[in-house]
Amino acid sequence: MAGVITASEPSWIAPFSGLSPRQFGKLVTVLRREGADAVRKGRPWSLPLEDRALLVAAYWRTNLTMRQLAPLFGVSKSAADRIIDHLGPMLALQPRKRFAKDTVLIVDGTLVPTRDHTIAERSKNYRYSTNHQVVIDADTRLVVVVGRPLAGNRNDCKAWEESGAKAAVGKTLTIADGGYPGTGLVIPHRRERGQAGLPDWKEEHNKSHKQVRARVEHVFARMKTWKILRDCRLKGDGVHHAMLGIARMHNLALTG
């Protein structure tokens, strides 16, 4: 069965991965170095590593069903499933272990509609969703940590710790919105009970805080051009692997 899409034709790479051919080539080189193309027991892969990586990226990018996606790469539905199960986790972003003293981070939670009801719950958007705590570097806009997914009805202030994001950043200065009270994060000033308004300096601080914090919303907007984050059909850890892999490709697209 001959496929239509292949990484050997550079014009297919950007539409189906969100990366330039050069960026995609760097990703494949790192995957090969990390053992993604190692000889394994059982039936050998019917596609080269480049095409397998493009298949996974295309699945996340387009959110086509396996029945739609597999023929485009000339493989069976079950083969496409196996490729995603094997390579998806290997594409995951590795959390940054150390931060410079002057680093400023921004955290926010984003909801991913998720059909696996064993890990998802109805959230404020009335859909079954998972809550993902995403931490970015305020200066570079790169994703540095993605917490483990929690049920979509989990408050951000609880999800911050329960997802592992808090432990991952340690004591690094981190900015958040007003949904993180009592967490020790830098959040906007609030009026106290009976207070008519905030002092001018607090209003000014909140204004600059909001402008900086908007950077994480821009990251979410870019990440959600990978359509699987709008309606994830994957089960179990699949949504986590997709979030981590997309974060890695987002970073690669920014840095080249």
From Swiss-Prot:
GO BP: DNA transposition
InterPro entries, per the entry: Transposase_11 (IPR002559), Transposase_HTH_dom (IPR027805)
Keyword Ligase: no
Keyword S-adenosyl-L-methionine carried by entry: no
Coiled-coil zones: none
GO molecular function, one term: transposase activity
Keyword list, A-Z: DNA recombination, DNA-binding, Transposable element, Transposition
Function summary: Involved in the transposition of the insertion sequence IS112 which inactivates the SalI restriction-modification system.
Family, per entry: Belongs to the transposase 11 family.
The protein's name in its UniProt record: Putative transposase for insertion sequence element IS112
